[in-house]
Amino acid sequence: MSTQNGMYYSLLEWFKTLNLNAPHANAEELADGVALAQALNQFAPESFSDSWLSKIKSSAAGSNWRLRMSNLKKVVEGVYEYYSDVLNYTLQHDFVKPDVQAIAEKCDLTELERLLQLVLGCAVNCAKKQSYICEIMCLEEELQANIMRALQELETSTRQTTEGGVVSSLSRNSLSGMLDGNAKALQSQMTEERDAMAQKCFETEKKMLLLIDEKTNLQQELQKIQQEFARLEHNTIGDDGVSLGPIQAGSVRYNELRRQLELVKEELLQSEGAREDLKIKAQQQETEMLHMQQRIDELMKSTAVLITLKDEVDVLRESTDKLKVCEAQLETYKKKLEEYNDLKKHVKMLEERSADYVQQNAQFEEDAKRYANTKGQIELFKKEIQDLHTKLDNESSKNVKLEFDNKNLDSKNLALQREKDNLLKERDNLREAFDELKCGQLTTNSGSLTGTTMSRELQPPAMMDKIQRLEAENKALREGQGGQTALAQLLDDANKRCENLREQMKTANERILSLSHASQSDDPILKENEFSKQIKQLMELNEQKTLQIEEFATQNSTMQCKITQLESSLNTREQEVMAYEVKYRKCVERAKEVIKNIDPRIASVLEANALEKSVDVIEEESKTKMSGMEEQLMATAFYRLGVNAQRDAVDSKLALLMGSGQTFLARQRQSAPRKSLTTMKSK
């Protein structure tokens, strides 16, 4: 066991003691991350749940190192989250995060040692830490010492956070950025070295070409010299035609040739030295070329590795982009799910409110049934009012006749008063002329005074006040009723009644004229007494009728107030129901959109149809109930309009009968108008 990997083998021996389903005897079996994930699930099943364990792919044990790297990455991220969230620890920067790629590709023991050290920290700090500590104590002393040293290193590299913050580790984006930066640096360095080597190769090739050219030139010169030497050796005549003589020792030719030979030897030695130097340089250049070729091969291998690293970086970038998109989609789905839950709650509230509205509609139906009974009473009151109107018409015709009679009596009374004044004047004259007959004249005058004052005593002061009050009210009613218009049918009825009354008036006038001619011959005082009695009886009957009409008017006004209150409450309810229906439809539409956005593959047509059917049923029920209430309210409003129109017609008839062409006494005898009519019209 080496000292460098002693801690790793100690941690591996401890890890072998765990009861796991996956194989975990060596580094190759641990490199897929399945055994580590099962161990974490065994340590803290609440944090490393079965759903998390299902994400670890057990098929990564083969040659696919990317699957192993993804499993190890999930394990490392889960461990860091466990340290930050559950244990409330933050790993400092001096503790290097395990290199997942090195473990997955090369089964690096140092990186695997760091990962096992983190797993050991999870085991010692979990809920079942006593049992795991006992298992560690059962190991050998050397293993225990190494495990304790690993725990101490882990404790020194962690610090506890008071706020339970999250571990600050390199994300996928930073990792891809670092890999990209390293790849770019390596690529730039390799390109620089390759350019330098290419430049050196180019220079050496130039030098080699120059040396080869020099070598060929020297060889050519050597051949020329040898040829010249052979020629000179065999020729006895020089170029200038001078005889050179035989080649013998001591001769001039021999000496000249000897001298030339020495020069050639020296040149040959120099050329051989240069050749040796060139050979040495060529060998050096060849060795440099071989070294440069090896360097170029290494650079090509590193470029291939760099290309693979680039591909991996691109894959990581794509995976990070996909992860970002998935995280954004997950956040949107979470928000939509929250909105869907809110919509569910809102729909429940709306259902409860709709149930309340159904109960209220049932109460309104019961109230409508109760008011149906009052409808019959209103019809009875209508019939009674019509009977009273006919009676009132009869009484008004009688009253008109009596008014004409009263006019004739007033004219007679005025004539009698004039005669009285004349008699008073004559009395004064007779007082002066006949003083002796004073007593007799006084007796006669007293009788005449009693006769003349009887007509004035027939009218008491209360009657005069009442007549004045009635006249003022009649004027007010005429002014208030001048701008009102009745319905067409009621106007036709009123016109027909007016024509009947005019015919009755004609007949009454003819009768009055005949009676006036007949009464001129009779005693006026007796007739005035009879007419006054008849007028009193008619006034009493008229007051009784007015009291009855006022009672009916008060009852009708109370019923109208109730009907108006019910109409206002019904209108408010209708507005509330419409507002809630609009809100309900909006909520249903939003719920449909949320369901479609959450999972568009699932056909949510059934739920939408069910909601639409429920909404249609509620709308039909509310429409039927509201239509019944509207019919009832229309009937009551029509009856109320009929009563008001009849009253207006009666008042208009009374106003026509009480025209301005009457005398003072005729206006005084008119019946008092109903006080409630003006108040009801104002309402």
Curated annotation (Swiss-Prot):
- The identity of this protein, by name, is Protein hook
The annotated subunit structure for this chain is: Homodimer. Interacts with microtubules via its N-terminus.
The species is: Drosophila grimshawi (Hawaiian fruit fly)
In the UniProt record, the gene name given for this protein reads hook
Tell me the domain comment: The coiled coil domain mediates homodimerization.
Specify whether Hydrolase is a keyword of the entry.
no
The record, for CDD domains, names: HkD_Hook
Q: Which Gene3D superfamilies match?
A: Calponin-like domain
Q: Which compartment or compartments is the protein found in? A: Cytoplasm, Cytoskeleton; Endosome; Synapse
Keyword Cell inner membrane carried by entry: no
